From Swiss-Prot:
Residues 1675-2035 are annotated as: Globular 2. This is Envoplakin. Keywords: Cell junction, Coiled coil, Cytoplasm, Cytoskeleton, Keratinization, Phosphoprotein, Repeat, SH3 domain. The gene is Evpl. Belongs to the plakin or cytolinker family. The keyword Phosphoprotein applies. PANTHER family: ENVOPLAKIN. Residues 842-1674 are annotated as: Central fibrous rod domain. It comes from Mus musculus (Mouse). GO terms for biological process: intermediate filament cytoskeleton organization; keratinization; regulation of antibacterial peptide production. Residues 1607-1631 have a biased composition (Basic and acidic residues).
C-alpha cells in the first residue's frame, strides 16, 4: 500500500538503513535490535490497516454509486447503514495510522515522510467519501434566501479551549491517547483553513487572526506532546531495563549452592567493560534533556520531574546492587577455592597415609625392596608432606576469612549478625552501607527479615546483606586437616627410624661376608667409605639445589626469598669447592690403591663408586652454576619489574588524579605543556622498559639452559613473562593516553582562540554602536535622517546575527571537546580501578572552564538581544515621532482651512469632521499596535519552539515563496568561488609538498595505511529555489566537503609525523666512535645503501606521479569553477523578476553563504598551520639531507654478522658430541644404579655358595651360551638401531620435502600442519636447488632488513642531533620526475598469467590421462597375474594327479612286468614336461618355506629381545645378578658386552643428534618461511608454479614411460621363459627317473622343513603367549598423532610471529578479524588405539573435547576411501578432513530467495506467509519433493554436483542446464552437502553454478517466485501470467511440468504444492494446459542419458535416478568418458577389475 515500502524497502517493513539481524552493526546493542523489531511490527500493522482502509473506500464508492443510481431512478436508498459503518471503521483505522506514523517518525524510519503522505491521501479520500455520503443521504432543503451559516468564532473558541485545557501524561498510556486525540484535532483545525480562506464578511479578518492563533497553539501543543513522548519513552525503557537487571541480581542464589559463579563473573565483567558506560551516558542524556525541558518551561514539568526522580533512584539502586554483586561473587569464589584446596590437601594426606600403611608397613609382607630403597622413597614422601604442611598452614590462615555461605540457606537456630554491603532505598526499606543488623528469619532466600540497631524490623533484600566471617565449618575442616597432618608426621618419623635400623642390620652381614673368603683390606674399606661419604654429601647438595629450582618464589616477598636463595647458593658453591678438593685427593689415593691390583670386594666396588662420584660431582657443579646464573638473572628481572611498576604507577597516578581544566585564558596551553612534559618524561623512562625486556631475555636464556641440561622447568618464568607483558601494555597505554589528551587539548585550544577572537570582535562592535535618540529640537528633516540611519543600523544588527551564531557554535564545539577530554580521563581512570566506575559518586559533568565559557556566551547573547531590542524600540520611537510631526502639520493645515472658510459651515460640522479624522487615525494606530503585538507574539512563539525543538523535527510550510537573485549575494558567491579556487590551489601545492616530505620520512619506518575520509551524508529539508543558484551551492558544498576530508587526512598525517619526529628527538644517541672510524675507512660503498637509494628514488617517482594527478584534479576543478561562473553570468535575472510576486532574500542561501565564509576562514587557518608545520618538516629534513651519512653510516654494521656454514656445522657437531656424552653419562648412571643393589645383595650372600658356583662355571664352560645369546641379542638390537637410523634419514628427507612445499604455500597468516607420522620420500635435486636459492634470498632479505634498520636508526640520530642545533629555515626546491607504468611489463605480466593458466590446464589434462592409464595398467597387471597364477595352479594340480596315478599304477603292476616294460620306456623314451613343471613348483615352494623359516626365526629373535627387555624391566635384580657374576668369570665376554653397549650408546646418541638436527632444521625452516613471506614476489610465484607444472608433467611422462617399459619387459621375460621351457623339455624327459627320486627326497625334505616350521610356530606361539602375559598389566597401546591448526600473524615491524590475541592487543587486527581467526584455530589429534579387536582411529578436537571416529565416518559415508587415502598421503588438509569426519557444514546465513520466497516444506514444514500478500486459502495443498539434485558417479561410487559433472564431461551441458532450471523452478539450487536450497544469485556467490547461465536460471526461477502484474501491481503465478498474456506458454511449460512431477504446481501467494486438477478449479491454469501437463505421452524428451546417450524426458530421468540414503536426494547415474569406453570394450569383466 505505502509507496515508502515499495521503494527499496528490504523486506517486511524493515528500514532501509537498519542492520539485519546478526550483522556486526546491529548485534552489540540490544536496544537497536528491540527498536528494529518494534519498527517491523509497526510497519506490518500499518500495512494491514492501510489495506483495510483501501478496501473500505472501494466498497464505499461502489455502494454510493449504486445508491446514486437508485436515487436518479427514484428508488429507495439501500446501502446507507453499511456505507456509514465502513466510513466509521475507516476513520478509526486512520486515527490509529496517524498515531503509528508518529511512532515510525520517532523510531527514525527512513521513509516515514512518504508513508505519511500516503496516509494523508487516504484521509483525503475518506473525507471526500464522507462529503459524498452527506451530499447523498443528508440533503437539507433550505429556503432560497437562507444559506449555510457557521459560527466560526464559537467553533474556533471551542477548539482553542480544547487545545488550552489539554493534559500531559502522567503515564505513557494516557500520553499515547492524548497524542492520538490531538492528531485528530490538528487535522480538523487544518481542514478549517481551506474554508476560512474563502470566507468573506466584516469579521473575516478577526476570524482568520483567531484561526492563526489557534493553529499556533495546536502546533505548540503537538511539539510539546512529541518531545514529552520521546522523553518518557526513553525513561520507561531505561526503568524497565534497570528493573530487569536489579531483578537478576536480587533473585540470584548467593549461598554455597550458587550455580555457575564463573559464568556470572564473566557476564558481570563483560557488562562492566562494555555496557556500563554506555548505559550511564544514556541516563545522563535523559537527565540533561529533562533539565533542559524544565528550564525552557515545558508545559509537562510534573511528569518530567517524576520520571527524572524515579530514574535517578533506580540508577543509584542499580549501582549499589553492582557493588553487592561484586562483593558476593568474591565471597562465593573464595569459599569455593577454599573448599577445593581443602579437598585436594585431604586427598593428598589420605594417599600419603595409605602409602605408609602399604609400602612401609612392618610385618605386612607387602613392602618390597631393600631398606635403602625404601628410605629413598620415604624422602620423596617427606617432600610431599612438607608441601601439604604449607598448604594446611595457608588453609588455617584463610579459614578465618571465609564467609559462612551455607548459613545463608539454612534456617538459623539463633540470631545472627549480618552486615549491609551497600546503600539501598526502595521507598519502604532503607539500608546504610556498613551498618550491622540482626537476622531474624531467612526462610525466603531472596528477602530476609532483619532487626536494626534501633529495634525496628524490616524486610531487606538478601543480596544486600552478608554474614561476616569466619565460617565454623571451614575452621573445623582446617583444624581437622592439621590434626591429620601431625598424625601423619609422627607415623612417618616412626617408619623412618625403623627403616634406618633395618638398613643398619641389613648391612652388617654384608660387611662380614668377605672375611670367610678373602682377607679384609682396611685401606680399600677406608677409601670406599670416604667415597661413599662424598657421594652422600654431593647428593645432599644436589637435592638442596633442585629444591630451590623446583619451588616457586614467595608471592609476598619474592626479592627477599630470591636473595636468600642466592646467598645460600653461594655458600653451597663454596662447600662444593671444598668437596671437590676432597674428591681430587681421594681420587689420587684410589688410583694409587688400584694400581697395586688389590683383591677383595672393596677393590671390586671402588672403581664403580669412584666413577659415580666423579660424574655426580660434575653434574652437581654444573647444576649449581646454572642455578646461580638463573637466580641472578631472576633477581635482576624482579628488581627491574618493581622499578618499572613504580615508574608506570607514578604516571598512572598523575593521569588518574588530573583535575578539570581551570578557568583562565592560558589554562589550555598550560595543560598542553604539562602533558608534553609528562610525555617527555615517559620517553625518558623508555630505557626502563627496554631494560625489563633485556632482563627477561637473560632470564629465559638461563632457564632454557637449566631445562635443556637437567630437564628442570623454572616455575617463576611464566609469571614473570605475564608481568613483563602487563607492564609493557600499561606503558603503551600511558603513552596513548597522553597523546590522545594532548591532541584533544590542542584542538580545544585552537577552538578557544577562535572563540575569543569572535567574541571580542562582537563585544567591541556592540560597545561602539551609535545612538540616534530623538531630541526636542529635532525637526522633520533631522527625524527622517535619524530614521534612515536607524534602519541601516537595524540591518547591520541583523547581519551581525551570523557572528553571534558563530560564537554559539564555537562555544558548543569547545564544550564538546572538553567533555570528550573528561570522558577519556574517566574511562582511563575506570580502567585503572574497575570499582571506581561503580562506587565513586557521579561527578559534575561541567567543569569550571566550561562554566565560564557558557556564562560568557550567555552574557554576550543577552547583550546582543538587548541591543537589538533597544534599537528596534528606538526605530519605533523615530517612526512615532515622524508620525506625530506629520499629524501636527495636518492639524495646522486643517486649522488654516477652517479659518479660511469663515463660517461656511457650522461649528458642529467642524467638530464632527475633526472627530472623524481622529477616529480614523485612532483605528490605524490600533491596527498597527495589534499587528506589532501579533508579530512580537509570533517571534516569541517561534523562539520558544526553536528552543524546545527536537534534533529530528519535521518542518511544514504551507506558503511557497519565490526568490530572486540578489546581486550582492551573487557577487559574494563569485568571490567565495574564487577564494575556493585559490584555496584549492594552495592546498594542492601544500599537499604535494607534504606528501613528498612524508614519503621521505615514512620510508624509514615502513609504509602505513592512509586513513580514508568518511562520507558524511546530511539530510536536509528541500526548499524551492532558483535552479542555477541551487546547483552552484551544491557544487560548492561538495567541493568544501572534499577539501575538508583532505584536510582531515593531511591533519592526521601531520600528527603522525609530529609524533614520529618527537619520538625520534627523545631517543638517546648510542654512537661507537672507534668502530665508526675503522669501518668508514674500510667500506667504500654499501650495497644495501645503494638499494635503499634506489628504493627512495622509486618512491620519489611515485610521489611525482601523485603530484601530477593532483595537478590534473586542480585543473579540472578550475575548469568546473569557470564553467559555473560563465553559467552565473549568462543567467538573466530580469525574466525571473517579472515572475516574482514577493521579493525576499532566501534565508537558507544567506546562512549557507555565511557558513561558507566561516568554513573558508577555518580552512585558511588550517592551511596556515599546515604550512607552518610543513616548513618545520622541510627544515628538519633539509638538515638531515645536508648532513653526510658517512659519519653514522656503519655504526651498527659491526653488530650484524652471519654465522658461517662451517661454524654451524661445528656447532652441530659439538652439540651432538655434548648430547652423546650426556647419553653416555645417563647410561653409566643407570648401570651404576642397577649395580649398587646387586653389590649389597652380593655382600649379603654366603661366600661358599657363590664360590662353588663360580668355580664350576669357570671349569666347565669356556663360553657361556647365555652370554652368546646375549651378544646375539645385542647385535640384533644394533641392527635394529641401524634400521632406525635409516628411518630417521628417511624422515629427514620427508621433512625437507615438506619444507620445500611449505615454502611455496605459506602466506602472511599461515596454518601449520604438524604430523608425527613418518612417510618415505625421495630427494628431489630440483627442490634442493630451489631450497638453496630460497635460503640465499632469505639471507639477502635479512641483510636488507638489517641495513634498513641501521639506516633508520642513523637517520633518527641525525635528526635528533640536527634538531638540537636548530639551523635557519631554507627553501628547498626539488625536481620531481613523473613516471608511468611500463606497458611492456604489463603485457609481459598478462602473457605470463595466460601461459600459467594454459600450463595448469595442460597439467590437469595430463594428470587425468595418467590416472586413466595407471588404472588401465593396474587392471592389465591384475588380469595377467590372475591368469598366470591360475594357469600355474592348474598345471601343478594336473601334474600332481598324473604323478599320483602313475605311482598307483606302478604299485599295482607286477614287479617283473614293471621291471621289464615301464622302467625302460620311461628312462629311454619319454620326457615328461608336467613332471618338470611340478619339480620346479616344488623347488619354489621349498625356497618359500625356507624364506618363511628365516622370517620366523628373525621374528622369534625380535620377540625374544622383547621378552628379555620385559624381563629386564620386571625383574632387574635377577638379571643384573647373573650378569655381575659372569662379568667376574669371563672378562673377554665382558669386553665384548662393553663394546656392544658402547656401539649401542653411540647409535642412540647419533639418533638423538639426528633428531636434534631435524628439529633445528625445522626451526630454521620456520624462521626462513616467516622471513620469506614478507619478501616473496608475484613473478617468482608464477615462475615457480610454471616450473613445478613442467616438472610434474615431465615426472608423469617419465612414470608413464617406465610403466610401459616394465610392461614390455615383463612380456619379453614371459616369452623368454616360454622359449627356455620348450628347449629344456627334451632334456628333462630323459631325467624323469632321477626327478622322481629327487621329488621323493624333496617331499621328505619338505616334510622335515614343515616339522621345523611347526616347531618354530609352536615356539612363536609360546613367545606370543609370554608377551601377551607380560602386556596384560599394561593398558591398550595408544598411538597419538598431533595434528594442530595454529594461526600465526607476522608482525609488520619486527617480522616475528604473533598469535591472533597478541595481534589484537597490539592493534594489528581489529576485533572482527580476531574473532574470525580464533574460530579458524583448532587442535586436532588423531588417536589410534590398538587392542585385541584391532586398531581404531578417532579424531579428537582438543579445543572442544569432541571425538569423531574415522571408521564410523567411513561406514556412514561421510567420507570416502579416496578422501581417506588423500588425507593419509598428506594431500587433504586436516581442517577439511576433520570437518568431513565430523559432518559439520557452515550454516546457511539467509533464506534461499528474497523475503517472499519461503523454504521448501521439506526443510521448513510450517506454513509461512509474506508481509506483502494475504495468506489466501490453503485447501488441496500437497507436500513437494526434491528434483534431480546431482550426479551419481558410478566409477568412484561418489556423488557430485551438476556443475562438477559438466566440468568432468560426465554430463551433457544442455542436460545440466535443464536440470539446474528444474531446480530453480521448484524452489532453488540444491546444495548436496547441506541439503539447503538457494536462489540463483546466492548459488552464484556460493559457487554452485556458473555465471554464464544466470539469466536462463532467473527466468526459470520466476516459475517459483511468480511475476508482478504491470497493471495491478499484484503478484501472479506463471499460470495466471500465461492466461493474461504476460508470458508465453512454450517457455513456461517445462517449468510447470517439473513442478507437477515433483509434487504439484506452486502459487507464490500460498505455501505448499497444488495438484493440477485443483489448480484448474482455482483458475490458476487453463484446462488445456492442465491436460497437457497430465498427458505423459506428450512429454518432451529434452534430456540425454549420461551412460546410454539416449534421449529421455524428465520423468524418465527421475525414474533412472538413485536415491541418496543419507539426504534422500535424487542422483542421476553417470560415469567418466575413459571408464565408459573401457566398460564398453570389456563388458564381461567384474566391477572390481574395472575399478
Amino acid at each position: 500500500m505505502f509507496k515508502g515500502l515499495s521503494k527499496g524497502s528490504q523486506g517486511k517493513g524493515s528500514p532501509k538503513g537498519s542492520p539485519a539481524k546478526g550483522s556486526p552493526k546491529g548485534s552489540p546493542n540490544k536496544h537497536n535490535r528491540a527498536a528494529t523489531q518494534e519498527l517491523a511490527l509497526l510497519i506490518s500493522r500499518m500495512q494491514a490497516n492501510a489495506d483495510q482502509v483501501e478496501r473500505d473506500i472501494l466498497e464505499t464508492q461502489k455502494k454510493l454509486q449504486q445508491d446514486r443510481q437508485n436515487g436518479e431512478q427514484n428508488q429507495a436508498l439501500q446501502h446507507q447503514q453499511e456505507t456509514g459503518r465502513n466510513l466509521k471503521e475507516a476513520e478509526v483505522l486512520l486515527k490509529d495510522l496517524f498515531l503509528d506514523v508518529d511512532k515510525a517518525r520517532r523510531l527514525k524510519h527512513p521513509q516515514a515522510e512518504e508513508i505519511e503522505k500516503d496516509i494523508k491521501q487516504l484521509h483525503e479520500r475518506v473525507t471526500q467519501e464522507c462529503s459524498e455520503y452527506r451530499a447523498l443521504y443528508e440533503k437539507m432543503v433550505l429556503p432560497p434566501d437562507v444559506g449555510p451559516r457557521v459560527d466560526w468564532a464559537r467553533v474556533l473558541e471551542q477548539k482553542q479551549n480544547l487545545v488550552r485545557e489539554g493534559h500531559y501524561g502522567p503515564g505513557m498510556a494516557e500520553l499515547e491517547q492524548q497524542v492520538a486525540e490531538h492528531n485528530i484535532l490538528q487535522r480538523e483545525i487544518e481542514a478549517y483553513g481551506q474554508q476560512l480562506r474563502t470566507l468573506v464578511g466584516p469579521d473575516a479578518n478577526t476570524i482568520r487572526n483567531q484561526y492563526r492563533e489557534l493553529l499556533k497553539a495546536a502546533s505548540w501543543r503537538r511539539q510539546s506532546l512529541g518531545s514529552l513522548y520521546t522523553h518518557l519513552q526513553g525513561c520507561t525503557k531505561q526503568l524497565s531495563a534497570l528493573a530487569d537487571q536489579q531483578g537478576r541480581i536480587l533473585q540470584q542464589d548467593w549461598s554455597d549452592l550458587m550455580p555457575d559463579p564463573a559464568g556470572v563473573r564473566r557476564e558481570y565483567e563483560h557488562f562492566k567493560q562494555h555496557e556500563l558506560l554506555a548505559q550511564e551516558r544514556s541516563i545522563n542524556q535523559l537527565e540533561d534533556d529533562a533539565d533542559r525541558m524544565v528550564e525552557l518551561g515545558h508545559p509537562a514539568i510534573g511528569p518530567i520531574q517524576v520520571h527524572q526522580e524515579a530514574l535517578k533512584m533506580e540508577w543509584q539502586n542499580f549501582l549499589n546492587l553492582c557493588i553487592c554483586q561484586e562483593s558476593q561473587l568474591q565471597r562465593v569464589e573464595d569459599y569455593r577455592r577454599f573448599q577445593e584446596e581443602a579437598d585436594s590437601v585431604s586427598q593428598t594426606l589420605a594417599k600419603l597415609s595409605s602409602n605408609l600403611d602399604t609400602k612401609y608397613g612392618f610385618g605386612t609382607g607387602d613392602s618390597s625392596g631393600s631398606p635403602t630403597e625404601l628410605l629413598l622413597q620415604l624422602e620423596a614422601e617427606e617432600k610431599q608432606l612438607a608441601i601439604a604442611e604449607r598448604a594446611v598452614g595457608d588453609l588455617q590462615q584463610r579459614s578465618q576469612e571465609v564467609a559462612p555461605l551455607p548459613q545463608r540457606r539454612n534456617p538459623s537456630k539463633q540470631p545472627l549478625h549480618v552486615d549491609s554491603i551497600c546503600d539501598w532505598d526502595s521507598g519502604e526499606v532503607q539500608l546504610l552501607r556498613g551498618e550491622r543488623y540482626t537476622l531474624k528469619d531467612n526462610a525466603d532466600p531472596y528477602t530476609w527479615l532483619v532487626q536494626g540497631p534501633g529495634g525496628e524490623t524490616k524486610s531487606a533484600p538478601a543480596a544486600c546483606l552478608c554474614i561476616p566471617a569466619p565460617d565454623p565449618e571451614a575452621v573445623a575442616k582446617a583444624s581437622r586437616l592439621a590434626t591429620e597432618l601431625q598424625t601423619l608426621k609422627q607415623k612417618l618419623s616412626t617408619e623412618k627410624n625403623r627403616l634406618k635400623a633395618a638398613a643398619v642390620e641389613h648391612l652388617q652381614p654384608g660387611q662380614q661376608a668377605p672375611a670367610g673368603s678373602a682377607p679384609a683390606d682396611p685401606q680399600g674399606q677406608t677409601l670406599l667409605s670416604q667415597m661413599t661419604q662424598l657421594d652422600g654429601d654431593l647428593g645432599q647438595i644436589e637435592r638442596q639445589v633442585l629444591s630451590w629450582a623446583r619451588s616457586p618464589l614467595s608471592q609476598s616477598s619474592s626479592l627477599k626469598d630470591l636473595e636468600g636463595r642466592i646467598h645460600s647458593c653461594e655458600g653451597t658453591a663454596q662447600r662444593l669447592q671444598s668437596l671437590g678438593a676432597e674428591k681430587e685427593a681421594a681420587q689420587q689415593e684410589c688410583e694409587a690403591f688400584l694400581s697395586t691390583k688389590p683383591t677383595g670386594s672393596a677393590a671390586l666396588q671402588l672403581p664403580v663408586v669412584l666413577n659415580s662420584v666423579k660424574n655426580r660431582y660434575n653434574d652437581v657443579q654444573s647444576l649449581c652454576h646454572l642455578y646461580g646464573e638463573k637466580a641472578k638473572a631472576a633477581l635482576g628481572l624482579e628488581k627491574q619489574i618493581q622499578e618499572a611498576d613504580r615508574v608506570i604507577q607514578g604516571f598512572e597516578a598523575a593521569l588518574a588524579l588530573e583535575g578539570p581544566v581551570p578557568e583562565g585564558s592560558g589554562a589550555l596551553q598550560e595543560r598542553v605543556s604539562e602533558l608534553q612534559r609528562q610525555r617527555k618524561e615517559l620517553l625518558q623512562q623508555q630505557a626502563c622498559v627496554l631494560g625489563l625486556h633485556r632482563q627477561l631475555k637473560a632470564t629465559e636464556h638461563a632457564c632454557s639452559a637449566l631445562q635443556n641440561n637437567f630437564q628442570e622447568f623454572c616455575q617463576d618464568l611464566p609469571r614473570q613473562q605475564r608481568q613483563v607483558r602487563a607492564l609493557t601494555d600499561r606503558y603503551h597505554a600511558v603513552g596513548d593516553q597522553l597523546d590522545l589528551r594532548e591532541k584533544i587539548v590542542q584542538d580545544a585550544s585552537l577552538t578557544y582562540q577562535q572563540l575569543r577572537n569572535s567574541r571580542d570582535n562582537l563585544s567591541s562592535w556592540l560597545e561602539q554602536l551609535p545612538h540616534h535618540r530623538v531630541q526636542p529640537s529635532d525637526g522633520p528633516s533631522q527625524i527622517s535622517y535619524k530614521l534612515q540611519a536607524q534602519k541601516r543600523l537595524i540591518q547591520e544588527i541583523l547581519g551581525r546575527e551570523q557572528d553571534q551564531a558563530t560564537v554559539s557554535r564555537l562555544t558548543r564545539d569547545l564544550q564538546e571537546a572538553l567533555q570528550d577530554y573528561e570522558l577519556q580521563a574517566d574511562t582511563y581512570r575506570c580502567s585503572l580501578e574497575p570499582a571506581l566506575a561503580v562506587s565513586a559518586p557521579k561527578r559534575l559533568r561541567v567543569i569550571s572552564l566550561q562554566e565560564s565559557i557558557q556564562a560568557q556566551e550567555k552574557n554576550l547573547a543577552k547583550a546582543y538581544t538587548e541591543v537589538a531590542a533597544a534599537e528596534q524600540q528606538q526605530l519605533r520611537q523615530l517612526e512615532f515621532a515622524k508620525k506625530m510631526l506629520r499629524k501636527k502639520e495636518l492639524d495646522e493645515d486643517i486649522q488654516a482651512i477652517h479659518s479660511a472658510r469663515q463660517g461656511s459651515g457650522s461649528p458642529a460640522h467642524a467638530r464632527t469632521a475633526e472627530s472623524e479624522v481622529l477616529k480614523t487615525q485612532l483605528e490605524e494606530e490600533r491596527k498597527r499596535v495589534a499587528e506589532v503585538q501579533r508579530d512580537l507574539e509570533e517571534q516569541r512563539q517561534r523562539l520558544l519552539q526553536l528552543r524546545t525543538q527536537q534534533p529530528v523535527a519535521r518542518l511544514e510550510e504551507k506558503e511557497v515563496v519565490e526568490f530572486y537573485r540578489d546581486p550582492q549575494l551573487e557577487s559574494n558567491l563569485s568571490q567565495a568561488a574564487s577564494r575556493v579556487e585559490e584555496e584549492g590551489k594552495r592546498r594542492a601545492r601544500l599537499q604535494a609538498e607534504l606528501e613528498a616530505v612524508a614519503q621521505k620520512v615514512v620510508h624509514l619506518e615502513g609504509k602505513r595505511k592512509t586513513m580514508q575520509p568518511h562520507l558524511l551524508t546530511k539530510e536536509v529539508t528541500q526548499i524551492e529555489r532558483d535552479p542555477g543558484l541551487d546547483s552552484q551551492v551544491t557544487q560548492l558544498h561538495s567541493e568544501m566537503q572534499r577539501l575538508r576530508g583532505e584536510n582531515g587526512v593531511l591533519t592526521a598525517r601531520l600528527e603522525e609525523l609530529k609524533d614520529e619526529l618527537l619520538a625520534l628527538e627523545q631517543k638517546e644517541m648510542n654512537v661507537k666512535e672507534k668502530v665508526v672510524v675503522k669501518e668508514v675507512v674500510k667500506v667504500e660503498k654499501d650495497l644495501e645503501m645503494v638499494k635503499a637509494a634506489q628504493t627512495l628514488r622509486l618512491q620519489i617517482e611515485e610521489d611525482a606521479a601523485r603530484r601530477k594527478g593532483a595537478k590534473e584534479t586542480v585543473a579540472k576543478i578550475q575548469a568546473r569553477i569557470k564553467d559555473l561562473e560563465q553559467a552565473i553570468s549568462s543567467v538573466e535575472p530580469k525574466v525571473i523578476v517579472k515572475e516574482v510576486k514577493k521579493v525576499e532574500q532566501d534565508p537558507g542561501l544567506l546562512k549557507e553563504a555565511s557558513r561558507l565564509r566561516s568554513l573558508l576562514e577555518e580552512e585558511k587557518n588550517n592551511n596556515v598551520a599546515l604550512a607552518r608545520e610543513l616548513q618545520e618538516l622541510q627544515e628538519k629534513y633539509r638538515v638531515v639531507e645536508k648532513q653526510k651519512p658517512k659519519v653514522q653510516l656503519q655504526e651498527r654494521v659491526s653488530e650484524i654478522f652471519q654465522v658461517l656454514p662451517e661454524t654451524e656445522q661445528e656447532i652441530r657437531r659439538l652439540r651432538a658430541q655434548l648430547q652423546e656424552t650426556g647419553s653416555k653419562k645417563s647410561g653409566v648412571e643407570q648401570e651404576v644404579e642397577k649395580l649398587l643393589p646387586e653389590l649389597e645383595v652380593l655382600r649379603a650372600q654366603k661366600p661358599v655358595v657363590e664360590y662353588k658356583e663360580v668355580t664350576q662355571e669357570v671349569v666347565r664352560h669356556e663360553k657361556n651360551p647365555e652370554v652368546l645369546r646375549e651378544i646375539d641379542r645385542l647385535k640384533a638390537q644394533l641392527n635394529e638401531l641401524v634400521n632406525t637410523n635409516g628411518r630417521s634419514q628417511e624422515q629427514l628427507i620427508r621433512l625437507q620435502g615438506e619444507r620445500d612445499e611449505w615454502k611455496r604455500e605459506r602466506s602472511k597468516v599461515e596454518t601449520k600442519m604438524v604430523s608425527k607420522e613418518v612417510v618415505r620420500h625421495e630427494k628431489d635435486p630440483v627442490l634442493e636447488k630451489e631450497a638453496e636459492r630460497l635460503r640465499q634470498e632469505v639471507r639477502e632479505a635479512v641483510q636488507r632488513r638489517r641495513a634498513t634498520e641501521d639506516a633508520v636508526y642513523e637517520l633518527q640520530n641525525k635528526l635528533l642531533l640536527l634538531e638540537r642545533r636548530r639551523p635557519e629555515e631554507q627553501i628547498v626546491v626539488q625536481e620531481v620526475v613523473v613516471t608511468q607504468k611500463d606497458p611492456k611489463l604489463r603485457e609481459e605480466h598478462s602473457r605470463l598469467s595466460r601461459s600459467l593458466d594454459e600450463e595448469v590446464g595442460r597439467r590437469r589434462q595430463l594428470e587425468l590421462e595418467v590416472r586413466q592409464l595407471g588404472a588401465r595398467v593396474e587392471e592389465e597387471e591384475a588380469r595377467l597375474s590372475f591368469e598366470e597364477d591360475r594357469s600355474k595352479k592348474l598345471a601343478a594340480e594336473r601334474e600332481l594327479r598324473q604323478l599320483t596315478l602313475k605311482i598307483q599304477e606302478l604299485e599295482k603292476r607286477p614287479p617283473a612286468l614293471q621291471e621289464k616294460i615301464i622302467m625302460e620306456e620311461v628312462v629311454k623314451l619319454e620326457k615328461d614336461p608336467d613332471l618338470e613343471r611340478s619339480t620346479e613348483a616344488l623347488r619354489r615352494e621349498l625356497d618359500q618355506e625356507k624364506n618363511r623359516v628365516t622370517e620366523l626365526h628373525r621374528e622369534c629373535q625380535g620377540l625374544q629381545v622383547q621378552v628379555d627387555l620385559l624381563q629386564k624391566t620386571k625383574s632387574q635384580e635377577k638379571t643384573i645378578y647373573k650378569e655381575v657374576i659372569r662379568v667376574e668369570k669371563d672378562p673377554v665376554l665382558e669386553g665384548e658386552r662393553a663394546r656392544v653397549w658402547e656401539i649401542l650408546n653411540r647409535e642412540r646418541a647419533a639418533r638423538k643428534g639426528r633428531e636434534e638436527d631435524v628439529r633445528s632444521l625445522q626451526e630454521r625452516i620456520d624462521r626462513a618461511e616467516a622471513l620469506r613471506r614478507s619478501w616473496s614476489r608475484e613473478e617468482a610465484e608464477l615462475q615457480r608454479a610454471r616450473d613445478q607444472a613442467s616438472q610434474d608433467c615431465g615426472r608423469l611422462q617419465r612414470q608413464l614411460r617406465e610403466l610401459e617399459q616394465q610392461k614390455q619387459q615383463k612380456a619379453r621375460q614371459l616369452q623368454e621363459e616360454g622359449r627356455l621351457l620348450s628347449q629344456k623339455t627334451e632334456s628333462e624327459r630323459q631325467k624323469a627317473a632321477q626327478r622322481s627320486q629327487a621329488v621323493t627326497q624333496l617331499e621328505a625334505a619338505i616334510l622335515q622343513e614343515k616339522d621345523k616350521i611347526y616347531e618354530k610356530e609352536r615356539t612363536l606361539r609360546d613367545l606370543h603367549t609370554k608377551v601377551s602375559r607380560e602386556e596384560l598389566n599394561q593398558e591398550t597401546q595408544t598411538r597419538e598423532t598431533n595434528l594442530s591448526t595454529k594461526i600465526c600473524i607476522l608482525e609488520p615491524e619486527t617480522g616475528n610471529d604473533m598469535s591472533p590475541y597478541e595481534a589484537y592487543k597490539r592493534g594489528v587486527i581489529d576485533r572482527g578479524q580476531y574473532l574470525q581467526l580464533q574460530e579458524l584455530e583448532c587442535d586436532w589429534e588423531e588417536v589410534t588405539t590398538s587392542s585385541p579387536c584391532g586398531e581404531e582411529s578417532v579424531l579428537l578436537d582438543r579445543k572442544s573435547g569432541k571425538q569423531y571416529s574415522i571408521e564410523a565416518a567411513l561406514r556412514c559415508r561421510r567420507i570416502s576411501k579416496e578422501e581417506y587415502h588423500r588425507y593419509k598421503d598428506g594431500r587433504l588438509p586436516i581442517s577439511e578432513f576433520a570437518l568431513l569426519v565430523a559432518g559439520e557444514t557452515k550454516p546457511s546465513s539467509s533464506l534461499s530467495i528474497g523475503s517472499i520466497i519461503s523454504k521448501s516444506p521439506v526443510c521448513s514444514p510450517g506454513p509461512q506467509s509474506t508481509g506483502f500478500f494475504s495468506p489466501g486459502l490453503s485447501f488441496g495443498l500437497t507436500e513437494d519433493s526434491f528434483p534431480i539434485a546431482g550426479i551419481y558417479d558410478t566409477t568412484t561410487d561418489n556423488k557430485c554436483s551438476i556443475k562438477a559433472a559438466v566440468a568432468k564431461n560426465m554430463l551433457d551441458p544442455i542436460t545440466g542446464q535443464k536440470l539446474l532450471e528444474a531446480q530453480a523452478a521448484t524452489g532453488g539450487i540444491v546444495d548436496l552437502l547441506s541439503r539447503e536450497r538457494y536462489s540463483v544469485h546466492k548459488a552464484v556467490e556460493r559457487g554452485l553454478i556458473e555465471n554464464t547461465s544466470t539469466q536462463r536460471l532467473l527466468n526459470a526461477q520466476k516459475a517459483f517466485t511468480g511475476i508482478e502484474d504491470p497493471v495491478t501491481r499484484k503478484r501472479l503465478s506463471v499460470g495466471e501470467a500465461i492466461q493474461k498474456g504476460w508470458m508465453p506458454q512454450e517457455s513456461v511449460l517445462p517449468h510447470l511440468l517439473v513442478q507437477h512431477l515433483t509434487g504439484g504446481l506452486i502459487d507464490p501467494k500460498r505455501t505448499g504444492r497444488i495438484p493440477v486438477p485443483q489448480a484448474v478449479l482455482c483458475g490458476m491454469i487453463s484446462e488445456d494446459l492442465g491436460q497437457l501437463l497430465q498427458d505423459e505421452s506428450g512429454y518432451e524428451k529434452d534430456l540425454t542419458d549420461p551412460i546410454t546417450k539416449e534421449r529421455l524426458s524428465y520423468k524418465e530421468a527421475m525414474g533412472r535416478c538413485r536415491k541418496d540414503p543419507l539426504s534422500g536426494l535424487l542422483l542421476l547415474p553417470a560415469m567418466l568418458e575413459g571408464y565408459r569406453c573401457y566398460r564398453a570394450a570389456s563388458p564381461t569383466l567384474p566391477r572390481s577389475c574395472v575399478r
